[in-house]
Amino acid sequence: MRETNSGGCYQRRARRGKSGGRIEQHLVGAKLQTRHPERDVPNHPGHAGDLQTGRTGDFEVDSISYHVTATPGRDVIEKCRANAAANRHPVLVVPGDQLLKAKHLAEDEGISDRVTILALEDFVAQNVIEISVEHGNDFYATLQQIIGEYNRRIEEAETDMALKIELL
């Protein structure tokens, strides 16, 4: 499959909708690890639940709890509510075509003012730009770095290597 995102062209071997959110989760983890190299950003399999692993979200950075999902529902909104009640700031990252759904769910549940909801594509693209500027790299080199980290995370935590991404 060939897709174009705001960071460049890539090939993803997994079919759209078949990853169960694992692609999205590992891409955010790779982005966070690349953005914060001094931190150890945990790498859990995509099926590992937050409660079972004692996490407040898929990723925790200081007082921020990141939740990553391919299909937002009331369950992730409830997790965001619990984060806010515990004085953590929830950030919900979803595919761009799910952004409005996530925002409507947050509004319906009355927490839209206490959660940041971002499109995955924008989240990654903004960080590609910021990291590139900070380190004096071109955007493609930074994207290569993030995808390299993503593929490392897939190899470490998943059994389905079809989830790996190849930059073209």
Put a short name on every predicted segment:
Residues R15-L168:
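Catalytic core segments in nucleotide and nucleic-acid processing enzymes
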Residues M1-R22:
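Interdomain/boundary linker segments immediately adjacent to catalytic/signaling cores
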